[in-house]
Amino acid sequence: MIIVTGMPGAGKDEFVKVARSLGFMDLHMGNTVREYASRNGIPDDDKEIGNFAASERKKFGMDIWARRTAEKIESDELTVIDGVRNKEEMDYFSKFSKSIYVVAIFANRKTRLERILKRDRPDDIRSMEGLIERDNRELSWGIGNVIALADYMIVNDESLEIFYERSRKLLFDHFLIRA
């Protein structure tokens, strides 16, 4: 099982696209948060969804989004989970697999903002100030610890083609040989 982490806009979704093209099953914790937020009438906006996610963590524990996402796990083999934000979520997923590997995706803040503005998701931030606020919120949840504990890191500061190449190489060299 691979856990993908990184700050907003770093390239986690693009890594997952590469993994999916190689036969990995993918689960997105952010989709789980958005699904639950929608069911609870939360507006599709970054701040509202972020507050909802934080509130649920406070009520039900830091691993609540891992528990809710895990309901969709079919097998631990060739599974990529995108969006782990804290060590408690990592620990929860370790119950499903004898081998958990964390891949951190890194890009600088300016590059991440440019990417976020291009992807134009309804719940995304629209300014550097908004990105700084979101980064601080995610850091308060413990994402920095997950990144620091990563088994592998891919720096995503060049073209998409180079990032895809780095992602494929990592997946082939470290994960597909074992499958």
Curated annotation (Swiss-Prot):
Record key words, sorted: ATP-binding, Nucleotide-binding
Protein origin, superkingdom: Archaea
Pfam families in alphabetical order: AAA_17 (PF13207)
GO molecular function: ATP binding
Residues annotated for ATP binding in this entry: 6-13
Family (UniProt): Belongs to the UPF0200 family.
PANTHER family, per the entry: DEPHOSPHO-COA KINASE (PTHR41930:SF1), UPF0200 PROTEIN MJ1399 (PTHR41930)
UniProt protein name: UPF0200 protein TV0279
Organism: Thermoplasma volcanium (strain ATCC 51530 / DSM 4299 / JCM 9571 / NBRC 15438 / GSS1)
